[in-house]
Curated annotation (Swiss-Prot):
Keywords: Amino-acid biosynthesis, Arginine biosynthesis, ATP-binding, Cytoplasm, Kinase, Nucleotide-binding, Transferase. NCBIfam families: argB. Substrate binds at G89, G90, R111, N217. This is Acetylglutamate kinase. Pfam families: AA_kinase. Catalyzes the ATP-dependent phosphorylation of N-acetyl-L-glutamate.
């Protein structure tokens, strides 16, 4: 099914135009009514669809933001939308690694992971972070189930490697071994569809199994993107610690075409942790039929603001546009 593009620049703003005078000058009534009226076309369009939400950053570490996120996820489910949450946990991993005086090296936003680091990653993501998120959603009235990629072979991974040129004077490429770092290879969609139909909200930690029963640390953005394509999700939403994607002058780009996103990666405007996020969004939009959003998780109830209001808050990546 091809979704109609109800984008921020596409919606007829006159359809929901209201004035404060209509509410006797009461700004609170005006704002509440305006927000609710703007949300209707989005709710109608996306009822029954799957949203993949990558959860991380400040929205995880701040108690009030975490609670507002959990309430938003439950509300999506109540509106007939099927949210699937994929979480990171880099800050908590760093905290535990510091306790054993171990530092991490990152390449293009991915953590090089040796055997010792992998044990910490699995313990923190699957045993601590995942269960905390699950409990928050359940406390908000949802039916969340915590999983990792290993459970029921939910996500199978394969080892990821990078090549690089050690000397610019020749074209000899060397392979950079990232350790136990993988990328999604296969998704057990049957399990996820069953959970959606059973009114459960999956909460997934990005620790996965691969060949020879090896365990891999997989970037949560990549997992979210793979799930979005496998589940034919209407939307991929990535929460970050920034306002969204910005241009070279630091200005927020509210709607971003695939070609523009690729240019930002190629010219270095997008860097470090934003690289896998944009790469994931581009891949999802190219191969799927929905849109991808990069939004500021520091804003309370940012999911609702981005998804159900005309202007939104962050950056939406689409297959056509600016």
């Amino acid at each position: 099914m091809k979704l109609r593009n109800v984008s921020k620049n596409n919606l007829n703003k006159e359809d929901t135009k209201l004035s404060i005078e209509q509410f006797g000058g009461n700004v609170e009534w005006f704002n509440i009514t305006k927000t609710l009226s703007e949300s209707l076309p989005y709710i109608q369009q996306f009822s029954g669809e799957t949203f993949i939400i990558k959860y991380g950053g400040a929205a995880m570490t701040d108690k009030k933001l975490a609670e507002s996120f959990a309430h938003d996820v439950v509300l999506l489910k109540q509106l007939g939308i099927n949210p699937i949450v994929v979480h990171g946990g880099g800050n908590k991993i760093n905290e535990f690694l510091e306790k054993i005086n171990k530092k991490s090296t990152f390449i293009n936003g991915l953590r090089i992971t040796d055997a010792e680091t992998l044990e910490i990653v699995e313990m923190v993501l699957c045993g601590l972070v995942n269960k905390n998120i699950t409990q928050l959603i359940n406390n908000a009235g949802g039916n969340a189930i915590g999983l990792c990629g290993k459970d029921a072979n939910l996500i199978e991974a394969k080892k990821i490697c990078y090549t690089y040129k050690e000397n610019q004077s020749n074209n000899v490429e060397k392979i950079l071994d990232m350790g136990f770092v993988g990328e999604p290879h296969d998704i057990n969609t049957d399990l996820l569809f069953f959970m959606e139909e059973s009114d459960f909200i999956p909460v997934i930690a990005p620790v996965c199994s691969g060949e020879n029963n090896l365990t891999y640390n997989v970037n949560a953005d990549l997992v979210a993107g793979a799930l979005a394509n496998a589940m034919a999700a209407a939307k991929l939403i990535i929460l970050t610690n920034v306002s969204g994607v910005t241009d070279s002058n630091g200005n927020l780009i509210s709607e971003l075409s695939v070609s523009h996103a690729e240019n930002l990666i190629d010219n270095g405007t997008a860097h470090t942790g934003m690289i896998p996020k944009l790469q994931t969004c581009v891949k999802v939009v190219k191969e799927g039929y929905g849109s991808a959003h990069i939004i500021d998780g520091r804003i309370p109830h940012v999911l609702l603001l981005e998804l159900f209001t005309i202007h939104g808050t962050g950056t939406m990546v689409v297959n056509s546009g600016v």
